[in-house]
Amino acid sequence: SFIGSAPPERYRALVRLARDAHMNMLRVWGGGVYEHDAFYEACDDMGILVWQDFMFSCASYPDFDEAFVAEVAREAELVVKRLRNRACVALWCGNNENQWIDDMCHTHDPQVPLFGQRLYDEVLPGVVARLDPTRPYWPGSPYGGNDHNSEREGDRHNWQVWAGQVYPRRFGE
């Protein structure tokens, strides 16, 4: 897909809409792009926090390929150096839905590796710890305990909102 070009005023207007709607955090999704500086400037100016994903989403990644791992580390270093002085960046997140999809497909089978796990557990948190140690790193979203889409810990993606598949909240509903 092609990303359109938006002038800084457009970023400011959209962030202002989020602020005026009483939002306090926006997520830069791992299946998208690292946003333009105008986005982060607007968030800084308007007090909006940013949940910043690294650009890994809904896929397997060849963490057994050392050249690929080195490229990921270089990209992460550039991104963290670029954004670490921004007041708006609240946390770094390793990926979007990769652990959860692995859980869904492989039902926790230890014989089936999650390609990319090394990136989320070693490479990316290592870069963040070295270059931006005051901010938290979260391995993925959703992520929590042994069930990456747990209702009891971590963060959760609720896929039951589609096509009226909402689960009951309590017995009898």
Positions of predicted regions on the chain:
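Extracellular glycoside hydrolase catalytic/binding regions
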Residues: 108-111, 115-173
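Alpha-helix N-cap and loop-to-helix initiation/capping positions
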Residues: 6, 64-71, 111-116
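Active-site environment of divalent metal-dependent phosphoester hydrolases
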Residues: 34, 99-102, 143-146
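Active-site-adjacent substrate/metal-binding segments within catalytic domains
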Residues: 1-59, 68-91
